[in-house]
């Protein structure tokens, strides 16, 4: 299995969503290898398929004043927050590689971070298999997961709190869970972490867990791939 990894740095949510949709079409047509987008978003709130507006705790007017947009999206899950200091990942993967088993795919996503946190930082993280998706440390969520699958190709993905401003989660009831908190790598270690270093580690552990040979490609490389494939399809 080959895996393209593209770190896009800071990207507006709607731009990232549009990019996912373009890549999804190419992956469905088998004109693109499995691709993992890693990036950050400016502060934004998204509502998944099971989400409720009542889990956003501040008014639309206040959000507008703060410049925080809200998007209703097709991923699984409830309400979540994205913002600077958080690694957001969008795997555009063919589920045929995991036997078209969605639960297995989510399990593997969780495994990436459980292994990364233990091996690289000595943090004992775990999954809550009986109730909730995601990766947890001491009862608090450090990685949120919510995917969508169309034609057996994945979209959306995960949000890993690295140096995230956790106060922003007070704007919402994260994932609709009133009795659970959130944490970050910075909070657990007691200091900020070199962000780009963690980005590389995420890619490395994706390669390990999914048995993939990964390579980093630039934003320009990705745009060129899309351009060439689109031009070919129009001929």
UniProtKB/Swiss-Prot annotation:
Residues annotated as domain BPL/LPL catalytic: 30-214
Main localisation: cytoplasm
Note: In the reaction, the free carboxyl group of octanoic acid is attached via an amide linkage to the epsilon-amino group of a specific lysine residue of lipoyl domains of lipoate-dependent enzymes.
Record keywords, A-Z: Acyltransferase, Cytoplasm, Transferase
Gene Ontology CC annotations of this record: cytoplasm
Pathway: Protein modification; protein lipoylation via endogenous pathway; protein N(6)-(lipoyl)lysine from octanoyl-[acyl-carrier-protein]: step 1/2
Active site: 175 (acyl-thioester intermediate)
InterPro entries xref list: aa-tRNA-synth_II/BPL/LPL, BPL_LPL_catalytic, Octanoyltransferase, Octanoyltransferase_CS
Protein function: Catalyzes the transfer of endogenously produced octanoic acid from octanoyl-acyl-carrier-protein onto the lipoyl domains of lipoate-dependent enzymes. Lipoyl-ACP can also act as a substrate although octanoyl-ACP is likely to be the physiological substrate.
Record-annotated disulphide pairs: none
Site positions for Lowers pKa of active site Cys: 141
Gene: lipB
Catalytic activity: octanoyl-[ACP] + L-lysyl-[protein] = N(6)-octanoyl-L-lysyl-[protein] + holo-[ACP] + H(+)
Family: Belongs to the LipB family.
Domain of life assignment: Bacteria
Name listed for the protein in its UniProt record: Octanoyltransferase
Cell location: Cytoplasm
GO biological process: protein modification process
Pfam families in the cross-refs: LplA-B_cat (PF21948)
Listed EC numbers: 2.3.1.181
One of the record's GO molecular function terms: lipoyl(octanoyl) transferase activity
Binding residue positions for substrate: 75-82, 144-146, 157-159
């Amino acid at each position: 299995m080959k895996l393209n990894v593209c770190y896009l740095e800071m990207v507006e949510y709607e731009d990232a969503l549009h990019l996912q949709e373009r890549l999804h079409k190419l992956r469905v047509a088998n004109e693109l290898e499995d691709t993992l987008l890693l990036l950050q978003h400016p502060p934004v709130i998204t509502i998944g398929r099971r989400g409720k507006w009542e889990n956003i705790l501040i008014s639309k007017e206040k959000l507008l004043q703060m410049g925080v947009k809200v998007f209703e999206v097709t991923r699984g899950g409830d309400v979540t927050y994205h913002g600077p200091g958080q690694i957001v990942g969008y795997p555009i993967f063919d589920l045929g590689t995991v036997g078209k088993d969605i639960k297995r795919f989510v399990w593997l996503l969780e495994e990436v971070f459980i292994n990364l946190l233990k091996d690289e930082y000595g943090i004992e993280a775990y999954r809550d298999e009986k109730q909730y998706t995601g990766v947890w440390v001491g009862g608090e969520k450090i990685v949120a997961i919510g995917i969508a699958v169309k034609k057996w190709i994945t979209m959306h993905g995960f949000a890993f709190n690295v140096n995230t401003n956790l106060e922003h989660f007070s704007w919402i009831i994260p994932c609709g869970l009133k009795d659970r908190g959130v944490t970050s790598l910075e909070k657990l270690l007691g200091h900020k972490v070199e962000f780009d270093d963690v980005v590389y580690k995420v890619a490395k552990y994706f390669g390990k867990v999914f048995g993939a040979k990964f390579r980093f490609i630039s934003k320009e490389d990705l745009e060129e791939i899309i351009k060439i494939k689109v031009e070919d399809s129009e001929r």
